[in-house]
Amino acid sequence: MPIQEKLVFARAVLNLSQQELAKNLGVSFATVNRWEKGHAIPSKRHEICFERFCKENKVVFDGK
């Protein structure tokens, strides 16, 4: 699953806005928005932070 889809999926499962996810990841709303639209790709550090956030919140991606 591409990172864009993972971001949208995680937000849906946790019922979070882009702003709320951004706050949890330590980035801006605009950054999450660009990631989800595919206009930017998270750095490795932010990708690891997102993966940790998902693990802590028990978000599981099928077919990972």
Task: Name each region found by the language model.
Residues 44-64:
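DNA major-groove recognition helix of helix-turn-helix/homeodomain DNA-binding modules
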Residues 16-33:
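Short alpha-helical DNA-recognition segment
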Residues 1-13, 51, 61:
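A short, Lys/Arg-rich alpha-helix, primarily the initiator
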Residues 12, 23, 55:
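Short polybasic/polar patches that bind polyanions
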